[in-house]
Each structure stands twice: as structure tokens, then as C-alpha cells.
């Protein structure tokens, strides 16, 4: 069964996505988003978007972005996003995202966009910032509302953006009549932290590479990064983000990878040294990442296969998106 055979049915829609600005996914991406999204594919109509338009808020090398998009697509598929179950599409291939973003930009007030915390944080750190960064949440709202998304997986850093989406949907509905489904947050409580600085999220742009487990890391790298991860001097395995952030981070990783609860993991390692947990976690991570890396490399050996998946899925996404645009334009009187 190929992506062209996916049947849009009455299941609730879940939309998620990832920016391909970096060609490397890390453990935070996998445990915080991809793993749980993969499990939704049988119970929901799932759209997974490679958000390359969002990547343009900061300058990109065109060839690098093009290559990274294929690499990220391969890693997502290898990590469990099944193109036979999900519509895995390229944002830029669905022009209706920009059409609806213009409409929503005229529903959103300047003050609402300016209050977005992520914009204020990033604009405070950068010199010359683009208007695209300012309107990023409006494009995100368009991404979500185009497909009548019932649920959107969000982390803490995106909750404000989703709330703006909900506000814009309700405002449009109030003014023009029922048009948009108001999406609900599917809160992602899993948060993976930097191995060397467990006060901050694991990131592709960490201060040091040793703080991040990339899904394509070699087994040796994975073992070294875990064994050298920051803990504390107590050598007592427990979960407490305030007093034991380092070991708590490792406990969460182990729990997510083994489907144990936090409490179960703490009980398993009660009375054991940190080195035992680190060794076991390293073994599990090596197995998981090696499987993903092997499948990624197989996919990258035939990039045309990946492109075909994206082209086919994007065509299907355009068909769904156009129905929304038709509905919106009719309400606005521009059809």
C-alpha cells in the first residue's frame, strides 16, 4: 500500500510537522514527537508536514535546505512515520497554506502577533529579523486549520501559537459563520534535556555536541555521550527535576524507550549506581538508533522514492486544502 492509497475517512485529523533546516534529528525529536505520532497513525487521519516554509524565517542555503529536506524525510519515515498510513507532505508544495495565511493575517491583530513569546525571544537575540518570523504563528495557524485538524501535538514552546490558532478560528467563525474546526491541543509532556546541561532542552544547536544524541550517531558516540552525561554526586537513582535534573533526564529517556512509567524505572534501579542505568540506557539507545540509521541509509540510497512519496502526498494534501480555501473564499465573497 502506497501513500497514494491513503483514504481520507471520518477519523479525527491530527497534524504535526518538523522543520528540515537541519539534516539531523535528535532524541528529543524522536521521544518528544515522532514516537507518539507514530502510535496515532491507526486511530487518526494523520498529516505529517515537512515545514520548509517555516525554515525560511532565517537565511538558508538553497541546496543545503533541499538536501536536508530529503534527509529529514528519510529519518522521519525510518523512525516510524509510515507513508502508507500518514500523508507525509512538503509544506511548500501546498500553495493553499500561503493563501489561508493571508486571510488569517487579516483576522489576527498586530498586538496578538507581537505578544508571541517566541517572537519576542528570538527578535531580542537577533539583529535584523524578517517579517516572516513575526507572521510565523499565522502561517502555523493556516497549516492547522487547512486540514480541519481536531488535535495538534504541541510542546510547551508552541502552546501559545496553538492558542492563537484557536482564537483566529473562533473569530472567523463568529464573523462569517461556522467554517473552521477549532483544534484541541494534544499536549506532549515528554521533554528531553541536554546531557551536559539538563536545565535546557536537547537541541540540534546545543552549546556542545556531547549534549545531544542524534538519531544517526554511531554506537560509540552514543555510549560516550550517555556515560559522560551530567548527573550529581549522590549516586541515588530517583526522579526530581529540581534537585536531580541530570539523572531525572536519564530516567525519562529509559521510561520512554521501554514504555515503563517513571515510578517503575526508579524501582527497577533502586539501590543501583548511575553507571548501571547509563549502561542499560546506552544499550537500548544503540539498538534503537542503529535500526533507524540503517533504515535511513536504505531510504537515502533511493532518493527518488522519497521524492515520490512527498509528491504523491502533497497532491493529496492540496486536494483537501483546496476544499477549505473554497469554503473560506465563499464566506469572504472573493469567489
Swiss-Prot record:
Catalytic function, reaction form: tRNA(Trp) + L-tryptophan + ATP = L-tryptophyl-tRNA(Trp) + AMP + diphosphate + H(+)
GO annotations of cellular component type: cytosol
Binding locations of L-tryptophan: 143
EC number: 6.1.1.2
Residue span of motif 'KMSKS' region: 201-205
CDD domains: TrpRS_core (cd00806)
Role, per record: Catalyzes the attachment of tryptophan to tRNA(Trp).
Similarity section: Belongs to the class-I aminoacyl-tRNA synthetase family.
Protein name listed in UniProt: Tryptophan--tRNA ligase
Source species: Tropheryma whipplei (strain TW08/27) (Whipple's bacillus)
Amino acid at each position: 500500500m502506497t501513500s497514494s492509497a491513503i483514504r481520507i475517512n471520518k477519523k479525527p485529523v491530527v497534524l504535526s510537522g518538523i522543520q528540515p533546516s537541519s539534516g539531523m534529528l535528535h532524541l528529543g525529536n524522536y521521544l518528544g514527537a515522532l514516537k507518539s505520532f507514530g502510535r496515532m497513525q491507526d486511530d487518526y487521519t494523520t498529516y505529517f508536514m515537512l515545514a520548509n516554509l517555516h525554515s525560511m524565517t532565517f537565511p538558508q542555503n538553497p541546496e543545503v535546505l533541499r538536501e536536508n529536506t530529503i534527509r529529514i524525510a528519510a529519518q522521519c519515515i525510518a523512525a516510524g512515520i509510515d507513508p502508507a498510513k500518514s500523508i507525509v507532505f512538503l509544506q511548500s508544495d501546498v500553495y493553499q497554506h500561503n493563501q489561508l495565511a493571508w486571510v488569517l493575517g487579516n483576522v489576527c491583530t498586530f498586538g496578538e502577533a507581537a505578544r508571541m513569546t517566541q517572537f519576542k525571544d528570538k527578535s531580542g537575540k537577533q539583529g535584523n529579523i524578517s517579517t516572516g518570523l513575526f507572521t510565523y504563528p499565522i502561517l502555523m495557524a493556516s497549516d492547522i486549520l487547512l486540514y480541519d485538524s481536531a488535535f495538534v501535538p504541541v510542546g510547551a514552546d508552541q502552546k501559545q501559537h496553538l492558542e492563537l490558532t484557536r482564537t483566529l478560528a473562533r473569530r472567523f467563525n463568529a464573523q462569517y459563520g461556522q467554517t473552521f474546526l477549532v483544534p484541541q491541543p494534544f499536549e506532549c509532556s515528554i521533554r528531553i534535556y541536554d546531557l551536559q546541561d539538563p536545565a535546557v532542552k536537547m537541541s540540534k544547536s546545543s552549546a556542545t555536541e556531547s549534549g545531544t544524541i542524534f538519531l544517526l550517531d554511531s554506537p560509540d558516540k552514543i555510549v560516550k555521550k550517555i556515560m559522560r552525561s551530567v548527573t550529581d554526586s549522590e549516586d541515588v537513582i530517583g526522579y526530581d527535576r529540581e534537585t536531580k535534573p541530570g539523572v531525572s533526564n536519564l530516567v525519562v529517556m529509559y521510561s520512554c524507550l521501554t514504555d515503563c512509567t517513571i515510578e517503575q524505572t526508579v524501582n527497577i534501579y533502586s539501590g543501583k549506581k548511575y553507571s548501571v542505568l547509563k549502561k542499560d540506557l546506552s544499550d537500548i539507545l544503540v539498538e534503537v538508533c542503529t535500526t533507524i540509521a540503517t533504515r535511513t541509509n536504505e531510504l537515502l540510497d533511493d532518493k527518488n522514492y522519497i521524492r515520490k512519496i512527498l509528491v504523491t502526498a502533497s497532491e493529496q494534501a492540496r486536494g483537501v486544502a483546496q476544499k477549505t480555501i473554497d469554503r473560506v473564499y465563499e464566506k469572504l465573497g472573493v469567489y
